Each structure stands twice: as structure tokens, then as C-alpha cells.
Amino acid sequence: MSKKSGRNIKPGELNLKEKLVHINRTAKVVKGGKRFGFNAIVVVGDKEGHVGYGLGKANEVQDAIAKGVEDGKKNVIKVPIVKGTIPHPIVAKYGSAKVLMKPATPGTGLIAGGAVRAVLEMAGIHDILTKSLGSSNPHNVVKAAIKGLQNISDANDVAERRSKSLKEVFES
């Protein structure tokens, strides 16, 4: 993702909220029985165009969630939002999870299921059509949605790549 890594975003300056997507209980068999652990996937965002995800693992649920939030704050990206939606349709794939996202007119609402809904809510997108294809594994679906949002080009990026002005981009 050399195009836009989002490394210049300082999460301390943002008012980030978190949303728990999935908790998984894991078991390790030891001599005395089973040791249980937990992992949690958490999406963080300010609902104004910044979103990130994190995975936390611990022996207690609350510790796993806290670690997930900290990890999510390290992975925050900026999403270009135009009138409450995305500028153009995009398809992203991570593993066997595939997420299709299409811009929608104002008033359509957030049409998304499960893990994708959490990512888009935290990003602050209000009108969008999505479809999750392939795997329904929440880890891979979240990563595919984030990858798609990261690959969205706004008008300024397109103009810069084409060495044209914004006006020329919209006229062509």
C-alpha cells in the first residue's frame, strides 16, 4: 500500500471511538485441562473520515479489547468522503473475503452487513451500498473493507497523477 499509507495521521489528535466487531475464545490444552484465551477485532474511528482496525489477544476479554483498541489506533487511515459517500465504486479482496462498495445518493443509508457496517460507521460514511462476497470471516472482511477504503482515489489524487488541474479532470 505505498499509494497512501496514512502514516502522517496522529491518533492522539483525533477523537476516536471504538466498536467491537468480533470476540473469539481460543483453547490451549495443557496437562491440567484447558487454558482459555480471547481475541477481539476492534474498529476505531472518529466518524469524520478516519478509521482503523486492531486485533487484541489476551487471557481476559477486556484486556483483549483494550489491546485491539491500541492496535487499531496504530493503523488509522484517512478516507475521502464526498457528500456522505465514497467518490467511486471499488472492489477489494483480502484472502477469500471480497467486499464491493458503491456510492449512493443522499438518503439511501448505510446498506452493509456485519463487519463492513462497523468499518463504514466508524469512518463516517452515511450513504453507501455494499456487498460482502466469499468468506464471511470477520477478520478478513474487515481487512478487505479497510483495503478498499485505502485504495479510494479522491479528485486531487487523480489530478496529481494525470498532471492536470481539478477542472480538467472533471471535464474529461
UniProtKB/Swiss-Prot annotation:
Keywords: Ribonucleoprotein, Ribosomal protein, RNA-binding, rRNA-binding. The gene is rpsE. Belongs to the universal ribosomal protein uS5 family. Residues 16-79 form the S5 DRBM domain. It comes from the Bacteria. SUPFAM superfamilies: dsRNA-binding domain-like (SSF54768), Ribosomal protein S5 domain 2-like (SSF54211). This is Small ribosomal subunit protein uS5. GO terms for biological process: translation. The N-terminal domain interacts with the head of the 30S subunit; the C-terminal domain interacts with the body and contacts protein S4. The interaction surface between S4 and S5 is involved in control of translational fidelity. It comes from Chlorobaculum tepidum (strain ATCC 49652 / DSM 12025 / NBRC 103806 / TLS). With S4 and S12 plays an important role in translational accuracy. Located at the back of the 30S subunit body where it stabilizes the conformation of the head with respect to the body. The keyword tRNA processing does not apply. InterPro entries: Ribosomal_Su5_D2-typ_SF, Ribosomal_uS5, Ribosomal_uS5_bac-type, Ribosomal_uS5_C, Ribosomal_uS5_N, Ribosomal_uS5_N_CS, Ribsml_uS5_D2-typ_fold_subgr. GO terms for cellular component: small ribosomal subunit. Part of the 30S ribosomal subunit. Contacts proteins S4 and S8. GO terms for molecular function: rRNA binding; structural constituent of ribosome. Signal peptide: none annotated. It holds the Pfam family Ribosomal_S5_C.
